[in-house]
């Protein structure tokens, strides 16, 4: 999870398994006022997902003031007939006495089915969230094997790990102007060779990502490689390339290559 808002670009399924429960968490791109074709596609993707789920979780940051973006989404919830649970995350960053006023503030704006304060980082109250969700979900056979934790491919996870490191290490200009594509993966018995392309829309962003004497991209590669090796369980050789594609977020060809071709009208 990135600390920077609105950086999710794809629907990501995370599967929670216990002996008698399977819950599929579907993380969608954040709904926002779109300024380009990519933004419109991400919004459409998020809205399409609503039809396929049983419960909506509205995740917000309890440590920041309720803002225009929150109110924009709450206004959209008026047309939703499914249960909507508000999750106030990052309660570890505020005082206990601030939690109830925060709950009351949101309660005045929408009749949430539940409001649950948690700290995902500290795992505070997350067990309660699971118990509440179990009460809202229908009985069903498991969709996934009990050992499965995500439906995402290795190629997608690798590109997201690289993009995550870019977001962690660069300034606020970069997040919405970068995407990563895993171009090639070659497996051997003892190692994996990976080539990943980092795409930005301006030349100065390429310079930021490469850094002085290539120091930034080396650090991005080092951190990403460590996580990829943990993911895949093998030695990884990671090659990172940076390419400038002006206005790529308005170019249907590139957006289609990212897997969004089903969301164009």
Spans of features found by a protein language model:
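Conserved, well-folded catalytic cores of nucleic-acid-processing
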Residues: 15-19, 34, 49, 53-56, ...
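Flexible beta-alpha connector loops of hexameric P-loop NTPases
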Residues: 1-2, 31-39
């Amino acid at each position: 999870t990135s600390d920077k808002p609105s950086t999710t670009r794809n629907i990501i399924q995370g599967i929670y398994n216990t002996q008698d429960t399977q819950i599929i968490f579907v993380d969608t791109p954040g709904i926002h006022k779109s300024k380009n074709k990519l933004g419109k596609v991400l919004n459409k993707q998020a809205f399409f997902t609503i039809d396929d789920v049983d419960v909506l979780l509205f995740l917000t940051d309890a440590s920041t003031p309720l803002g225009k973006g929150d109110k924009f989404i709450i206004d959209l919830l008026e047309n939703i007939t499914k249960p909507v649970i508000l999750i106030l995350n990052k309660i570890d960053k505020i005082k206990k006495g601030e939690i109830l006023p925060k709950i009351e503030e949101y309660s005045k704006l929408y009749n949430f089915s539940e409001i649950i304060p948690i700290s995902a980082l500290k795992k505070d109250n997350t067990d309660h969230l699971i118990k509440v969700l179990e009460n809202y979900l229908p009985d069903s056979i498991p969709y996934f094997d009990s050992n499965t934790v995500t439906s995402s491919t290795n190629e997608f996870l690798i590109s997201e790990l690289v993009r995550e490191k870019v977001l962690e290490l660069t300034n606020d200009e970069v997040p919405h102007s970068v995407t990563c594509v895993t171009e090639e993966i070659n497996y051997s018995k003892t190692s994996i060779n990976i080539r990943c392309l980092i795409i930005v829309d301006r030349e100065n962003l390429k310079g930021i990502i490469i850094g002085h004497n290539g120091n930034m991209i080396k650090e991005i590669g080092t951190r990403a490689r460590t996580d990829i090796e943990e993911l895949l369980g093998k030695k990884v050789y990671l090659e990172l390339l940076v390419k400038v594609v002006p206005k790529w977020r308005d170019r249907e060809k590139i957006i289609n290559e990212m897997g969004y071709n089903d969301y164009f009208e």
